[in-house]
């Protein structure tokens, strides 16, 4: 889609860079594939904050996305849409055989009129869904299942992909964007291609208000707090915190390993990140 730059006619537009939405549909989302979505504001069922910096934002309708791709037959791409709930774009697919529509994550390069299909005999083309055992080594895939039939769990954000780098018995070796090489059952499904909107990472919101529209609240530095609120808080005048950077709960940040030792999925990881 490309990027959209703004002339600095106001302080907030100076330096603002957004993703261009040229080519996206301006229609309302498919009503049969939407549902209400209530914002939690980062609170749990007790009303306590479990995720900081969440709250407010524009109202959103949730788009029901087909992450399992169990429907066989050819589908026609009707339009590419913006989804406020995720960074990638959506494609509305129409199946003429049974007059059913569904949303899928749009891969890069997909456009209205394209044909997609799911099944073991599908061609190796963006948007087609196959079992990993039927996809050639070296292919880029997204929407990858971790367990057969559970639906896609890996490589779903804008610009994300995984690469098939080899096979090992009933498993496929998959290199993730982090550099990690992981064993995935070859009976899991994956979709060919790279998720759309790779320029999402290059956007600059330009003003605090645009973050608030997205439901993101301000982040306060620990050194600006009181001692009761943060390990870096307090002190006379401006201080540097007086210790190595930690979270509000005293856990070292800046590179500390957070993965649990002896995790059951360790046996499926062939190479760590990097």
UniProtKB/Swiss-Prot annotation:
Homology family: Belongs to the universal ribosomal protein uL2 family.
Q: Which SUPFAM superfamilies match?
A: Nucleic acid-binding proteins, Translation proteins SH3-like domain
Q: How does it assemble?
A: Part of the 50S ribosomal subunit. Forms a bridge to the 30S subunit in the 70S ribosome.
The biological process GO terms on file are:
cytoplasmic translation
- The encoding gene is rplB
Q: Which domain of life is it from?
A: Bacteria
Task: Write out the GO cellular component annotations.
Answer: large ribosomal subunit
Q: Where is the composition biased (Basic and acidic residues)?
A: 263-274
- Please give the name of this protein: Large ribosomal subunit protein uL2
Q: Name one GO molecular function term.
A: rRNA binding
| Native organism | Wolbachia sp. subsp. Drosophila simulans (strain wRi)
Q: In what ranges is there compositional bias, type Basic residues?
A: 45-59
Function description: One of the primary rRNA binding proteins. Required for association of the 30S and 50S subunits to form the 70S ribosome, for tRNA binding and peptide bond formation. It has been suggested to have peptidyltransferase activity; this is somewhat controversial. Makes several contacts with the 16S rRNA in the 70S ribosome.
């Amino acid at each position: 889609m490309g990027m959209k730059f703004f002339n600095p006619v106001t302080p907030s537009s100076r330096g603002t860079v957004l993703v261009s939405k040229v080519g996206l549909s301006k229609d309302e989302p498919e009503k049969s594939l939407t549902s209400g979505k209530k914002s939690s504001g980062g609170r749990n069922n007790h009303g306590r904050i479990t995720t900081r910096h969440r709250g407010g934002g524009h109202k959103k309708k949730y788009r029901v996305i087909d992450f399992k791709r169990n429907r066989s037959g050819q589908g026609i791409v009707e339009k590419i849409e913006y989804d406020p709930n995720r960074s990638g774009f959506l494609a509305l697919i129409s199946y003429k055989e049974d007059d059913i529509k569904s949303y899928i994550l749009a891969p890069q390069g997909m456009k209205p009129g394209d044909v997609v299909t799911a099944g073991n005999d599908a061609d190796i083309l963006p948007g087609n869904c196959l079992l990993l055992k039927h996809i050639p080594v070296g292919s880029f895939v997204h929407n990858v299942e971790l367990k057969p039939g559970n639906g896609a769990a890996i490589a779903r954000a804008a610009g994300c992909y995984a690469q098939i780098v080899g096979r090992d018995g009933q498993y496929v070796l998959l290199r993730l964007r982090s550099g990690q090489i992981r064993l995935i059952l070859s009976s899991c499904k994956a979709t060919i291609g790279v998720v759309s909107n790779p320029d999402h990472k290059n956007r600059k919101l330009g003003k605090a208000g645009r973050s608030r529209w997205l439901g993101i609240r301000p982040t306060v530095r620990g050194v600006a707090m009181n001692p009761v609120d943060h390990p870096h808080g307090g002190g006379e005048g401006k201080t540097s915190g007086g210790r190595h950077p930690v979270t509000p709960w005293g856990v070292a940040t800046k590179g500390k390993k957070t993965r649990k030792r002896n995790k059951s999925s360790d046996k499926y990881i062939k190479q760590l990140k990097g």
